Every structure is written in structure tokens, then in C-alpha cells.
């Protein structure tokens, strides 16, 4: 490597979420640039329907990504809230704690993406780990929830998502790709179970996963 090339590389600090390869058809990671464009559109729509208010300055708004993969939406929402709430909560630690405990929530689509998403928002794959920037979570999930979910088979199809039993009835060693958010008859009760207490989300945003096959 030349001295010039080495200097150029030392000056480059790429966003790690732009450097991760997609894992499968249903784990196509949203580029940060696209996520931010969507959040810009969200802010415009919020202002248009809420008397011109800035969503990023509201400490009561709750956000949910129901199909979290890299955690890019949760991370970028957090970054915007950290800036927007500076006037209301001038102490940075208090501000970050409030945002990540009370405003930003995700439901991961696989075990691997749950770890990746937590790393993106908590700086630790375990929300209550020693490296986590939030010190008061009682579980390793924090507010980025994941647990293995099974399909509900009826006439060779999942009665919730329509997936083929032939394709998706898999062993314990493989992911089921049954997404918890749509595999329930009562999402409000499930959200209360996952995150504790009655939950009401003001914003639901994300990039829904693709299916592994089209049958």
C-alpha cells in the first residue's frame, strides 16, 4: 500500500451499516441514506397533521420498527431525537436514557438481526451488557425484542402469512421466518407482553422483509 493510499484510508470513517452484505431475500438491509429520506418524509407528514410541530422535539412520541434488521431506523430516529430534545433535556445521558427506554422500540425478524440491531442502538448486542449505553434495562432484549415464532399451519399454509408448509416447516436449527408482528390475533396484547404495560405507538416505520420463495 502506498503512503498516499494509507493516508486516504486513515481519513475514511464509513458508516458500518453501509458495509454489511445482505444475508438472504428477507434480510435485505435498508441503506442509511434511504432510511433518512423516509424519516424526512415522516417529519414533513407529522408537521402537516400536527400544526407544524417538529416530531423530533416531542419526548412523548413512541416509534416502532416491527421488522427490525440492522437497526438503522431505530438508530437514525435516536440520533434525531438526541438533537431535537436537547432543549428539553440538556443532560445528554438523561436524554439518551429517556429516548432508548421510552421512545424507540423494535421487533427483530431473526436472532442474528436482533443482535445486530441492539448493537446499532445500544452499542451492545445485550441491552443490559456492560458495554450498553443504557444501564437500567432488566433484560438482554431491552426494547428490541425477539423470540422464535412458529407458523400456524392450516391446509398446508400458514393461516397468518400464507407461507407454504412444504418450504417453511423447518428444524430447530433454522430460522422459521415467521414474523411475530403478523403472527398473532391480538397485536396490542402481544406488544404489552413484549415491552411491558399498555403500549400505544405513534409511528410505525420500517422496511418489511421479503419472502425466501414466492410459492
Predicted regions and their residues:
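SAM-dependent methyltransferase catalytic region
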Residues: 1-215
